[in-house]
Amino acid sequence: PATHEQLWEVTEGIKFPILKSIAVCLEDAVLEKDVQTAMVNLKHLLQKRLEQPNLKAPAIFIRPRNIEMAKHIVDWDLNHTYSGMILPKFTLHDLKQWMDILPLNINLMPTLETKEIFDMGHNMELNQALKYDFHKTLCLRIGGNDLLSCLHLRRPKNSTIYQTPVG
């Protein structure tokens, strides 16, 4: 989470030197009351990376809560200090909005975690759109817990998402 007390040490590979990439989360790992603090921390982190570049540091992917937050982050004009963004609750319907705000130089990781993912027609259209419009898509992420929720199911406490029907 962007509220982590050792955010700099983690994202620079000091705390975990074998990391190749890391997600800085502003979504579900951050409580609503802590969002502003998380945003301040993230901006400070990116500014510090600008001042102290480290080519050996892990690639950073930012996970905003929504499109509006992503736009706010992009507007800081620090886009060259991180590798990409994880796009939450991504669907064909919001692809255009994402395209309008995201800089061309970053990689994208759309997260499929809404009920639309159960619609084969939607998925076929999304596949085509990603091929042509989102050529910087690094990978697709699956939001397993959210997909289970769409089915009115919950992951058992003592199991991982990979031990459920989604996994």
For the regions a protein language model found, what residue spans apply to each?
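Expand to "…catalyze enediolate/carbanion chemistry for C-C bond making/breaking, isomerization
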Residues: 1-167
